[in-house]
Amino acid sequence: MSFVPTKVFFTKGVGRHKEYLSSFELALRDAKIEKCNLVTVSSIFPPKCERISVEEGLKLLSPGQITFAVMARNATNEYNRLISASVGVAIPADDTQYGYLSEHHPYGESDEQCGEYAEDLAATMLATTLGIEFDPNKDWDEREGIYKMSGKIINSYNITQSAEGENGLWTTVISCAVLLP
């Protein structure tokens, strides 16, 4: 059986509860994907895959459905501990080629820091497969310009969720790319 996703939507959530597993469930609910049996997959953005809204994507899901997703996930039970989770995306200009999705789930990084890092990871993976020359020691903004000016990478972005731990509770953050037929 061959399954290449034709649609993708991006969602994120945060959950807090005294139990670790329950905080994850609440993060899934916040992201509106709790009714699915999620199967995490590695990080290829399929050729000709269309990005759709969360609302459109949710209409295509049924309770109990086996659903493939690239998921970044992080959790803490430490008070004031900053956690984040991000999925970065890099899409080639040629829609018959595949792109990349990357997961990043650090401690102590803001939405912006975490998101830029995840986006940089995805764009760098794509750039290396497309033969784009770049200096890995340059900062992300400079490399992003090089990638996009090459004409081979058309778009990159990220979806990121961060939160601080609350006293006595588990806090879980997730960011997901949900892949659909």
Swiss-Prot record:
InterPro entries found in the cross-reference section: Pyr-dep_his/arg-deCO2ase, Pyr-dep_his/arg-deCO2ase_sand, Pyruvoyl-dep_arg_deCO2ase
Entry annotated with the keyword Oxidoreductase: no
Gene3D superfamilies from the UniProt entry: Pyruvoyl-Dependent Histidine Decarboxylase, subunit B
Catalytic activity annotation: L-arginine + H(+) = agmatine + CO2
Enzyme Commission identifier(s): 4.1.1.19
Cofactors required: pyruvate
Molecular function terms from GO: arginine decarboxylase activity
Entry's cofactor comment: Binds 1 pyruvoyl group covalently per subunit.
GO biological process: arginine catabolic process
Keywords: Decarboxylase, Lyase, Pyruvate
Site (Cleavage (non-hydrolytic)): S42, S43
Modified residues (Pyruvic acid (Ser)): S43
Family under the similarity heading: Belongs to the PdaD family.
Identification of the protein by name: Probable pyruvoyl-dependent arginine decarboxylase
Originating species: Chlorobium limicola (strain DSM 245 / NBRC 103803 / 6330)
